[in-house]
Amino acid sequence: MKKISMIALTLMMGAASVFAQGWGRPPVEDPTGYKDTYKDYFTVGVAVNINNVTDPDQIALIKKNFNSITAENDMKVVSLQPREGEWNWENADKIANFCRENNIPLRGHTLCRHSQFADWMFVDDKGNEVSKEAFYERLRNHIHTVVNRYKDIVYCWDVVNEAMADGDGRQSPWMRTEPNPYRQSRHYKLCGDEFIAKAFEFAHEADPNALLFYNDYNAADPAKRDRIYNMVKKMKDAGVPVHGIGMQGHYNIYGPSNEDIEAAIVKYSEIVDVIHFTELDIRINEEMGGGLQFSRGKEAPVPAYIQTLHQAKYADLFKILRRHKDVVKNVTFWNLSDKDSWLGANNYPLPFDKDYKPKAVYRTIKNFDPALDNAVIKEDFVPSVMNQPQAEYPMDNSQGYARFRVEAPQAQSVIVSLGLGGQGGTVLHKDENGVWWGTTDGPMDEGFHYYHLTIDGGVVNDPGAKNYYGSVRWESGIEIPAHDLDFYQVKNDVPHGQVVQVLFPSPSTNSTKRAFVYLPPQYNGKKKFPVLYLQHGWGEDETAWHNQGHANLIMDNMIAEGKCEPFIIVMTYGMTNDVKFGGLGGFNFKDFETVLVDELVPYIDANFKTIAKKDSRAMAGLSMGGMETRAITLARPEVFGYYGLLSGGTYSPEDIKDPSQVKGIFLSCGGKEGPDMIMKAAETLKAAGVNAKGYASPGTGHEFQTWRRSLLEMAPMLFK
């Protein structure tokens, strides 16, 4: 029994990438990393532990991607001097030496923090609290010792961390005074906010050339943002050498909002010239405190929609950061991989997984399109031509952007399966009325696109759009108007054929099957016509070519313009959807060959006025339908005289034993599918004496606009 291998089948189902890379071609590893793609924007750093800088594979990952390093914990006060005069330099020195050996600048972290500090600085040898002067002397000694030891490799320091209070800053009814903006740490209780100024003064004394940062989490929260702003402004007005603000960036897929992040950058840039994102990770939940501790654990499968939210959050954030490259000068990921993360692998926080392999989000961050960062979207949106009656959304504009509106006030997330560079979809954002809005990150390819909504993990159709069968389900559809759409438009002055449904018996499957038959305007039941058997792709059915593909309108217009001979088109279900990803080890095309050749062709010849000869019969198919076409035409060369593969592979001269056995071969794909292979195959066939034509649809991929144009190009060569 003849079979199509599952490997080949998978290639066809994902043919956009297949054609782009070329069949049989081994993947080429990209030698560039974050530091290369962001060289014109900011340095990209990573927080490391001692294992990261001693394991060869992890070292290679660091050297490829990062041009700034932070010691995650090994330069904190308690790590370096847990007791007065007792210094632990081993790990910090190893990390510093790694940076020296590899010429990677080091971010110093951190000189003064409420946690992981040295409590001995606050008490004497009898346990009594010391004066603030004694505390300052100890703090100065620590800062000078550390800064001087590493000043040759450290280019900046997080001097003071997390000195500001959390909360929204509002005064509760029972409070006599407004809440204190400062964290009630031992430092603050002993010294007030003077300890902040002193720490910066001590660091600047030790290294006047180092950039000095105040660093805090929740720095995009509007209330805390203002507290940080006011404190830093107060310090700078007093002459304290605060050079920059560090926004830690411990975010989650639901927040903070893009608007709050950008507003914080803009506000901070009023008082500092440099902003670093110092501790970036994005977890997949909103848990804090004990709940966050509980959610750590063994890495578990992450639902696809959560991965999309994760990618979108990182993509949105980096777009904002690139937009503010004038002030954002460093972005540091807080750990190398999920395995190292303080959040745990189960929270999925970083671009590298627990095995140090890049996730899809790695490529989302790295392979950005600079043209889209500051793109100006024209506000000339109009309802899609494929909307339900009276539905305003979805919309599209003259540039090819699509905009969506969904009412789901109780939902936590809404994703449209279009956009994000083909990497998952467009994440919508909820307004104050519970309505979700979103616009694709960039223009869509011209033509028809399937899509659906994912609301909190549940897949539903867009109530505003009409439905079309694709992806083995009824999907929503949207049409991005093409510059050349005239060839498939309904025209009042053009005679129209008809599409009729037929039910034909299939003894081989013990069922009655359905086909749609396009009859040209000239069909009157007297004259006989040639026939094209035209197949859909995986996930579709016999409705695809006349609904999504507009095959009937394309033919009407071409016939009216005298561009091709009138012929019949037969469209039936190719039995492709019995194949499931990861399921069967192969696809048996022999069953469909029997249905098509031995049952449908005789039925059509018996019930319609056809020229029942090989040279007046053609078979073509798109994507997986092209695979079927290739297999059946080679298996039954006595049946079809013309072959067409539309994003469905190629023929070679070795396949065609006798050039006279075939009247013509048409090969096509989208211009984004790697057309060189198609064009070369067509030229090779022609050199072998076969009448062959190759075509690449400009600016499209593995999609219906490619196949509409392919039919337009193929039809004139048929039945000559």
Task: Go through the PLM ranges and name each one.
Residues P27-D30, Y34, Q81, N88, ...:
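Aromatic-rich peripheral "rim/lid" segments of glycoside hydrolase catalytic domains that contact
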Residues Y41-G45, S68-T70, P105-R107, V154-D158, ...:
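Structural preference for beta-strand elements that scaffold enzyme active sites
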Residues I377, Q390, N397-G425, K430-K720:
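Non-catalytic cap/lid and distal C-terminal segments of serine-dependent acyl enzymes
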Residues P26, A47-Q58, V77-E90, F117, ...:
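Acidic-and-aromatic substrate-binding clefts and catalytic sites of carbohydrate-active enzymes
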Residues P31-T32, K64-P82, E90-F213, Y217-A219, ...:
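Substrate-binding cleft and catalytic face of glycoside hydrolase catalytic domains
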Residues M1-G24, A371:
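Bacterial Sec-dependent N-terminal signal peptides
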Residues D30, T37-F42, N49, T54-P56, ...:
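Noncatalytic carbohydrate-binding groove/subsite architecture in carbohydrate-active enzymes
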Residues I50-N65, R138-V146, K224-M235, I261, ...:
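Short, acidic/polar
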